Amino acid sequence: MIKKIISFAVIVSSFFIFNTYLHAATGPANIYKITITKVELCETGSTLSNCLNPVDITVGDGVADVDIAAVTAGESAGVVADFGKGIPGKTYTYVQTILSRSVNAKGSVGSCYTANDAASGTANGYATGTQTSGSEAEVTLLVPDFVDPTNYSMIEGSSDAAGTSLRVAGTVGASDTHFRARKILTTPYTAKAGINPTVFLAFGTSGAIMNKAGTCGSAQTLAAAPPDQTVTIQGQ
């Protein structure tokens, strides 16, 4: 699937980045719905593992079931964050986002297709697929649980949508319902009073379904993999 460019007046999101996790094979998603519950900006001095002086820029309660696989160039997937909430004069270098572990997706990896067989994403993040292409269906997949603080210090699991109870960096647990992820901005953003920049996001879902080792159709092998994503800010 081609990369899609999305233009937002006051929106930004970050997404999980462990696309090499478990070295699993990946395939395209035709449907890929995510839920974003909180977005924060991180001041200069922040790192992948630490958001310095975070400022909450979430609009309302965030957005649910945004299908990033269906959004075409120039369309908005919903307003989730307002850069106007940044503190004037402060410069921000990272964005930090809380997302649901659950992803509604439809797609395949090779000859293994997502299947609505009531065996959707289990607590460890994997679901049973099908080898019959005609049975492909939208299903709930989960971001897999993992422990890898060396390579994924930008991610930590959360037991709630607000991020009030977080695991240590590089860990997502089976009982977590959400996770928090940090991503560096392509260009630092300096907040100015009365000015909201235009934020461009580029999503690609050609590798958004993940398939680990096992027999498709009898073993739980499918999980959500991250879409390609970049954030660019204009009009500062």
Please name every model-derived segment.
Residues M1-I2, I17, A223, P227:
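Generic N-terminal leader/processing signal
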Residues A9-I17:
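Bacterial N-terminal signal peptides
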Residues I17-A24:
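Sec/Tat signal peptide C-region and signal peptidase I cleavage site
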Residues A24-Q236:
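A short, solvent-exposed, low-complexity linear motif enriched for acidic/polar residues
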Residues M1-A9:
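Bacterial N-terminal signal peptides that target proteins for export
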